[in-house]
């Protein structure tokens, strides 16, 4: 019997990109496919999103993987390069680089490149992670402008730290800082991630950087409902994680279920054992009561998540059988709900799917 399965709907992926483009017709789409395509498969996602204007990845290894399979679209590496060998590969494979520190500027000055490089200057407007400060950025921009190793115009970008917060004060400050510092700079601009895409239409500039929304998942989780209807109406979940019932047991009242005896049967009742666990990427900290979907109805998780199995309450599903499919998240059960129950975010759940899960592509 197959173990857990992640079904990837490539039609939904293409649909989501088309919706993004329709909602921001004046912007180019830089599709974020880092971290193995947010757990959906780097190459699979890139091939499905051939209509994206460019791809964003975290590191050079991801970019080279795409080039090796024949992806010819522009690719921008968010962390840039860190030595001369990497910089040479950027030029050889036509990779765009985000420039976020003085060491990278120095490398550009001293390295002889076979061809000029497309770069984006990262301006730190408040994320306080990577990038040049607002005060440093004009001088760095002027340095880059004089480099013969760099294609012109230079891209200008920032990253929003709090765009998914209903309190807009800090994000509006970041956007104001970015527009102010780049006012006299010439070059394409990029500000918004998925949350910013919905919440800050004034920041939909030359390039947008959709990430989690490409995969049909709200960047706001389940708590921020301002865009809930729009997201549910226009976007479709791409991944459905499912596993099969491998055993059905009738338990007595007060029988405990699973490690630690944390959950006991309130009455005589049937339970099902499902072939998925934290060894597959299902969150160990999902508590009893976390929903799963069985034959179109919600059933609650009971007891602790094991490495290879979970148990679910079958009292609402007396006709369930061994071999039935159980949906852990995806079509009909948003992953945002599971993330909330487990005290995490949907991004983490998607990225933690392990290698023993079988991936299947569908077009639906």
Swiss-Prot record:
<comment type="pathway">
    <text>Amino-acid biosynthesis; D-alanine biosynthesis; D-alanine from L-alanine: step 1/1.</text>
</comment>
<dbReference type="InterPro" id="IPR009006">
    <property type="entry name" value="Ala_racemase/Decarboxylase_C"/>
</dbReference>
<comment type="similarity">
    <text>Belongs to the alanine racemase family.</text>
</comment>
<feature type="binding site">
    <location>
        <position position="307"/>
    </location>
    <ligand>
        <name>substrate</name>
    </ligand>
</feature>
<keyword id="KW-0413">Isomerase</keyword>
<feature type="binding site">
    <location>
        <position position="129"/>
    </location>
    <ligand>
        <name>substrate</name>
    </ligand>
</feature>
<dbReference type="InterPro" id="IPR001608">
    <property type="entry name" value="Ala_racemase_N"/>
</dbReference>
<protein>
    <recommendedName>
        <fullName>Alanine racemase</fullName>
        <ecNumber>5.1.1.1</ecNumber>
    </recommendedName>
</protein>
<comment type="function">
    <text>Catalyzes the interconversion of L-alanine and D-alanine. May also act on other amino acids.</text>
</comment>
<feature type="modified residue" description="N6-(pyridoxal phosphate)lysine">
    <location>
        <position position="34"/>
    </location>
</feature>
<dbReference type="InterPro" id="IPR029066">
    <property type="entry name" value="PLP-binding_barrel"/>
</dbReference>
<dbReference type="InterPro" id="IPR000821">
    <property type="entry name" value="Ala_racemase"/>
</dbReference>
<dbReference type="GO" id="GO:0030632">
    <property type="term" value="P:D-alanine biosynthetic process"/>
</dbReference>
<feature type="active site" description="Proton acceptor; specific for D-alanine">
    <location>
        <position position="34"/>
    </location>
</feature>
<dbReference type="GO" id="GO:0030170">
    <property type="term" value="F:pyridoxal phosphate binding"/>
</dbReference>
<dbReference type="GO" id="GO:0005829">
    <property type="term" value="C:cytosol"/>
</dbReference>
<feature type="active site" description="Proton acceptor; specific for L-alanine">
    <location>
        <position position="259"/>
    </location>
</feature>
<dbReference type="Pfam" id="PF00842">
    <property type="entry name" value="Ala_racemase_C"/>
</dbReference>
<dbReference type="Pfam" id="PF01168">
    <property type="entry name" value="Ala_racemase_N"/>
</dbReference>
<dbReference type="GO" id="GO:0008784">
    <property type="term" value="F:alanine racemase activity"/>
</dbReference>
<dbReference type="InterPro" id="IPR011079">
    <property type="entry name" value="Ala_racemase_C"/>
</dbReference>
<keyword id="KW-0663">Pyridoxal phosphate</keyword>
């Amino acid at each position: 019997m197959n173990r857990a399965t992640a079904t990837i709907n490539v039609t939904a992926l293409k649909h989501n990109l088309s919706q993004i483009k329709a909602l921001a017709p004046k912007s180019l789409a830089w599709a974020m496919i880092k971290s193995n395509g947010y757990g959906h498969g780097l190459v699979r996602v890139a091939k499905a999103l051939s209509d994206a204007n460019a791809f964003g990845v975290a590191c050079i290894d991801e970019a080279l993987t795409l080039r090796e399979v024949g992806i010819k679209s522009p690719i921008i590496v968010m962390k840039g390069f860190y030595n001369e060998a990497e910089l040479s590969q950027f030029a050889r494979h036509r990779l765009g680089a985000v420039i976020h520190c003085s060491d990278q500027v120095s490398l550009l000055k001293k390295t002889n490149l076979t061809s000029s490089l497309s770069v984006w200057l990262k301006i730190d407007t408040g994320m306080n992670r990577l990038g040049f400060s607002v005060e440093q950025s004009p001088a760095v921009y002027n340095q880059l402008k004089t480099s013969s190793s760099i294609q012109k115009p230079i891209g200008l970008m920032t990253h929003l730290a709090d765009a998914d917060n209903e309190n807009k004060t800090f994000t509006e400050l970041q956007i104001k800082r970015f527009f102010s510092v780049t006012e006299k700079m010439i070059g394409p601009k990029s500000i918004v991630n998925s949350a910013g895409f919905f919440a800050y239409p004034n920041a939909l500039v030359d390039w947008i950087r959709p990430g989690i929304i490409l995969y049909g998942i709200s960047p706001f989780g389940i708590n921020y409902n301002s865009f809930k209807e729009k997201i549910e109406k226009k976007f479709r979940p791409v991944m459905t994680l499912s596993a099969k019932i491998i055993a059905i047991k009738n338990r007595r009242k007060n029988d405990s279920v699973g490690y630690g005896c944390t959950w006991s049967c309130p009455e005589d009742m049937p339970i099902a054992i499902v072939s998925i666990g934290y060894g597959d990427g299902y969150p160990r900290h999902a508590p009893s009561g976390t929903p799963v979907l069985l034959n179109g109805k919600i059933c609650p998780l009971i007891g602790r998540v094991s490495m290879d199995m979970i148990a679910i309450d079958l009292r609402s599903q007396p006709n369930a059988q061994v071999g039935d499919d159980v949906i852990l998240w995806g079509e009909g059960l948003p992953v945002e709900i599971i993330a909330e129950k487990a005290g995490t975010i949907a991004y983490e759940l998607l990225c933690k799917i392990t290698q023993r899960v079988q991936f299947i592509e569908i077009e639906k």
